[in-house]
Amino acid sequence: GIDGDFTLNNVPKGSTLVISFVGYETMEVKWTGTPLNIILKDDTQMLDEVVVVGYGTQKKVNVTGAVSMVDSKVLESRPVQNVAQALQGQIPGLNMSVGNSGGALDASLNINIRGAGTIGDGSSGNPLILIDGIEGDMNTVNPNDIANVSVLKDAASSSIYGARAAFGVILITTKNGISGKTRVNYSGNLRFSDAIQKPNMTNSWDFATYFNEAQRNAYGTVIFDEDDMNRIKTYMSGGYTDPTKPEYYGTVAGSNGRWQNYGGAFANTNWFDEFYESWVPSQEHNLSINGGNEKITYLLSGSFLDQKGLLRHGSDKFQRYTLNGKISVKLADWVTMNYNNKWTRENYDRPTYMTGLFFHNIARRWPTCPVVDPNGHWSADMEIIQMEEGGKQTSEKNWITNQIQFVFEPIKDWHINVEGSLRQYNEKY
């Protein structure tokens, strides 16, 4: 009823009743056969949950702005490359989109909170990202080192940061050492990547048939004559079985003595399958050590990520190394020192030929063109030789962050924070 009265029928004596209501703690009561008078307690734990806002923390019950939080359990359970990918779909109003770099292994996702609204060319709608209180790139942080992520969505929540927080704030707090026995934690995963939207490429017979029809309608001639069509049919049926014969490779020598690629070739190549790998393996390893006592706590963590790209030819790989150290020392009853050091290195290799024209040309290559010629060389006019032998672009990026903080408490609950930080970044190609 309206006063919380309820009646249950056919309940055996000695049964345990579970009573719950929104905003109250769940209670279990054993029924002895007599009427029960049950009083539920307020669920203060939900309201006491601490979220990071501005320069400090608040209980949820006191937060009036729009704030969302994700804890470490969510981030650690997702085998992804970086923090931005781990946050996808986890926070309402946090939108991710692919930028101009596309799906390159070192590319960053575009992030906006509750949509983007900008004024004038060159303006940006990106949120302010703070890692342990200082601005940084979230993709340089190992997701396993994160304790929680708070997203401040509205003006009331982010106003303390001023104009730079006009599009919201993302606050990332990394884990601290925990007093007690030394604990060693290791986690690793092996994952596989695949391209999920590869276009379907027509086979050589259908391609040659349609091409001849178009050529005949336009010019009254054909590109693939009857001999070519017969060779295509034989090749697709596996009729060429002698690797010492040029027909085995889907080509013959032309009148100029060169192996033919376009007109005159009769292989059956799916160029999307040729350039893109399937089920590419990647691996990640995380190791952390933490412990301490009432006076001092420490944490040391490291990680290694080896992410392979989807390109079959040439070097396409991304590697990230991270090292994070934290120590907290109680120098006196009224002063505590916190020191934090982070180091991240990213190495990325990709073929020099990786331009927009490369992806454009994959779809333009005829399926009749062979991958290799009868001499075992990569076929001319195809991108494979540029990918394999045209060199590679190598980049190395390093981030080093040092933070130190002194927390003074001259009287109970009056905290004075004195902080300093130094960030270093360098890259070479």
Regions found by a protein language model. Name each.
Residues A195-T202, R312-G314, N338-R365, L422-Y429:
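Outer-membrane beta-barrel and related beta-rich outer-membrane complex signature
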Residues G239, A253-G257, N261-A267, K342-T344, ...:
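Acidic/polar loop-and-plug regions of large Gram-negative outer-membrane beta-barrel proteins
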Residues L87, P92, R364-T368, K412:
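Proline-centered flexible-loop/turn and helix-kink motifs
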Residues G1-N324, T336-M337, T401:
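Short, small/polar-rich motifs associated with maturation and membrane association
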Residues E277-I296, S303, Q386-Y429:
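Outer-membrane beta-barrel transmembrane strands
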